[in-house]
Amino acid sequence: MTLTTEDFNYDLPHELIAQTPIKERDESRLLVLDHETGAMEDKHFYDIIDQLNPGDAVVMNNSRVMPARIYGIKDKTGGHFEVLLLHNIEGDRWETLVKPAKRAKTGTKIIFGDGALTATVTKELEHGGREIVFDYDGIFMEVLEKLGEMPLPPYIKEKLDDPERYQTVYSKEPGSAAAPTAGLHWTKELLEKVEQKGIKLVYLTLHVGLGTFRPVDEDNIEDHKMHSEFYQLSEESAAALNEVKKQGGRIVATGTTSIRTLETIGSKFNGEIKADSGWTDIFIKPGYEWKVVDAFITNFHLPKSTLVMLVAAFTGRENILNAYQHAIEEKYRFFSFGDAMFIK
């Protein structure tokens, strides 16, 4: 049966889109879903510890969101530009989204702030993408911290008082254009409790890129082309995960970015987990054969998105749509600053 984008649609009341983070990260709600039976339980995120067993591994993406949105003016004419950094190609060369794209022709020079940072458009890409080369004095990330702002998703209309609330407590590798949001619920204290229970904490890196902002345009989901994102799994993390597998523990992924990294590696090495880095455009959808992940934490995703499709690949389409309907009836909060699910 060919699945269409419409098969992953659902009606979400606008007021359930969370506009601000909840006061305490781990007091968000948690919908526990059994992927085989479809059985559900309403909990809070701090109850996650009861869902984890000694010998399991919790995998987290330690990518950090860059203050990736910067505003500049065109050299000579003074026209305004908004530039969103997507990923670092090499050195000072970046793939970006520039608005208005039509004014950013190859050779255009853009000035940011008082001129401490300038950029030249070197290549025009599809979807308003532009390759640009930056010029500055000092350390790029420090210059960016001064001039850039957090690129919150378009459905969040309120200003974020504390930018750290759009970072996970363990974020350390700058490079994402959006947060790996399932991880926003973890607190340092809760992670310590998890570790004390005999559960391994394992980190990987996937820099969240352009695809997060790109809807599925095709009716037939098979026609959708996924974006590429950079990932990295260290020798140490691979060894820890293999040890857990060997002892019969579960690999519990925090978020779709951790899932995509682990399943990319599992697909590449015939189900084995090895240290690896590279670019992934894996599209996990119903019919996918899972290689590594046994259970996962995830937020509630946008209708018709590739992320709903990924979750449906694990739970079955009917189970996940039923769970979303339950969450709507129970007034769970949706999307980046919303509540979480634990799917086992």
From Swiss-Prot:
Xref: HAMAP family: QueA
Family listed: Belongs to the QueA family.
Organism of provenance: Pediococcus pentosaceus (strain ATCC 25745 / CCUG 21536 / LMG 10740 / 183-1w)
Xref: Pfam families: Queuosine_synth (PF02547)
Superkingdom: Bacteria
GO biological process: queuosine biosynthetic process; tRNA wobble guanine modification
Keyword set, alphabetical order: Cytoplasm, Queuosine biosynthesis, S-adenosyl-L-methionine, Transferase
InterPro entries documented for this protein: QueA (IPR003699), QueA_dom1 (IPR042118), QueA_dom2 (IPR042119), QueA_sf (IPR036100)
Entry's Gene Ontology cellular component terms: cytoplasm
Identification of the protein by name: S-adenosylmethionine:tRNA ribosyltransferase-isomerase
E.C. code: 2.4.99.17
Keyword Translocase: no
Subunit structure: Monomer.
Role played: Transfers and isomerizes the ribose moiety from AdoMet to the 7-aminomethyl group of 7-deazaguanine (preQ1-tRNA) to give epoxyqueuosine (oQ-tRNA).
Catalytic activity line of the entry: 7-aminomethyl-7-carbaguanosine(34) in tRNA + S-adenosyl-L-methionine = epoxyqueuosine(34) in tRNA + adenine + L-methionine + 2 H(+)
Subcellular location: Cytoplasm
GO MF annotation list: S-adenosylmethionine:tRNA ribosyltransferase-isomerase activity
Primary location group: cytoplasm
Recorded metabolic or biological pathway in which this protein acts: tRNA modification; tRNA-queuosine biosynthesis
Gene3D superfamilies: QueA-like
